[in-house]
Amino acid sequence: FKRAVKGGYAIPAFNFNNLEQLQAIITAASETKSPVILQVSKGARAYANPILLRYMAEGAVEYAKSLGCNHPEIVLHLDHGDSFELVKGCVDLGFSSVMIDGSSLPYEENIELTKKCVEYAHQFDVTVEAELGVLAEEVIDFSTRTGCDSLAISIGTSHGAYKFKPEQCTRDPKTGRLVPPPLAFDILHEIEEKLPGFPIVLHGSSSVPQEFVNIINKYGGNMPG
């Protein structure tokens, strides 16, 4: 995270459930010489078995080396953990990092749950991603009191490509397609001012319209359409 912040680039995170998806992720990361976060959801753990997923990730490191990547930067991450027990299970299994998503809880309960996960994970040098939502004015208090290592915020992206409700969208008059609501870059800017250099996580990149990809590229990104 520190190198990414200093270098001005983002680290991609991809969910995988099976070998074929993992091969595609590692091949792309190796070809682009990019660090990568391998994400496992609660559902993937139930489907593919957490032990198998852990050793698949270890195999991914060796696979990246075989593709010419001498020092692969690959981590295994729990995506959207919803309980301390789930987070603890992943930490105990050897995950590099975990996410605890308490954003649906009242603010103080979110802090309490996140702090509990952070205190446990940090004993094993495991980093913790937390989720706050859209309240930019609370990011300093939240990050300070929980000790989280990165923070997921909501600026208008959605988890997955088609998870916006129709009433949240507008309809393109030319194509008739539903267009997701615009991204709240003002919130992102405000949070960056409040917590300069703190790792911010944006979920749901598969739903970002091309116009916003163009804006990212305008300010130094390198994302083909």
Regions found by a protein language model. Give the residues of each.
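Conserved phosphate-binding/catalytic loops in two-lobed NTP-binding clefts
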Residues: 224
